[in-house]
Amino acid sequence: MTASALSKWPTCLACLRRLAQPFGTSAARHGEPRARAVPVIRPIVHTQTRAASHRMRLQDQGVVVRLLEDIPKFGRKHAIFRIERGRMRNEWFPKNKAEYMTPARFQELGLTRDAIGEVDRSFVIMSALEAATRPKPEEQKTEEPVPEVQISQVNVPDVTPETAHALLSELIPNTLTFHREPVPIPISQPKPALEPKISPLIARHVPASTPETPSTGEARRAIFGSVSSSDILNQIKALVSGHEEASRIVLGPSSVKIVGLAEDNDRIRHLGRWEIEIAVARAGGLDPVRKSVEILPSAQ
């Protein structure tokens, strides 16, 4: 079965002209009358064929992106390369793994097109590599257990309360000295009082005025920092550390008490002399060891 002449529409102008002519006749040549036109037998079917184009289409090289995190088999963070548009649009950009590198973005980062690199297929994150090389639980069970080395503990005899009381009384000096920088006292200059005018004969018999002595509050000057019971305890431990038996005495934060301070206060904040009590554990009827602490101004 033959196809009709109009089954396929021609696309060139010459084919349209041939189809527009009547069948059985041909157009007269230039200068010849139409009556002398020579009849020509034309086929009814006109099939137009076109060869397929073998030209290579330009391959889409993808879009330029910049990684915002390490991605295995693609590259490290801040790497710039080309990637498929679909992967960037559907996976990386929604999950904030990469950003588009537009000309404006290149200018913001101070980069040029020369910074565009290649995909690093050999890049592997170390955590993923460690997870891949980590032995499985079944393999860990098959490993032989390493025998534990047992260290024998040496039993050190405890110091009796009576011995501890005697050693602390002997090794600790009567006064423990600490140096702190005192807070300067602002000096206010009083206005000179107007002296009444008296006769020189009377002023000769008036006794000279004596300077005023500082008050008790000025004598107890404040200091920068403070001396706590922990500071006193550390100094006591340093004094007894050289003695073989006294170094085994158990002393804790509650072993030192500063006499004259409130119960919730264990810090000395002024210059002066303070009494302390050193309690011995399990002392029973023994009194605490009494010593003194003196806070002196540090050398300027």
Swiss-Prot record:
Its main location: mitochondrion. It is found in: Mitochondrion. It holds the Pfam family Ribosomal_L9_N. GO terms for cellular component: mitochondrion; ribonucleoprotein complex; ribosome. The keyword Calcium does not apply. GO terms for biological process: translation. Keywords: Mitochondrion, Ribonucleoprotein, Ribosomal protein. Gene3D superfamilies: Ribosomal protein L9, N-terminal domain. GO terms for molecular function: structural constituent of ribosome. The keyword Cell inner membrane does not apply. Component of the mitochondrial ribosome (mitoribosome), a dedicated translation machinery responsible for the synthesis of mitochondrial genome-encoded proteins, including at least some of the essential transmembrane subunits of the mitochondrial respiratory chain. The mitoribosomes are attached to the mitochondrial inner membrane and translation products are cotranslationally integrated into the membrane. Component of the mitochondrial large ribosomal subunit (mt-LSU). Mature N.crassa 74S mitochondrial ribosomes consist of a small (37S) and a large (54S) subunit. The 37S small subunit contains a 16S ribosomal RNA (16S mt-rRNA) and 32 different proteins. The 54S large subunit contains a 23S rRNA (23S mt-rRNA) and 42 different proteins. Belongs to the bacterial ribosomal protein bL9 family. This is Large ribosomal subunit protein bL9m. It comes from Neurospora crassa (strain ATCC 24698 / 74-OR23-1A / CBS 708.71 / DSM 1257 / FGSC 987).
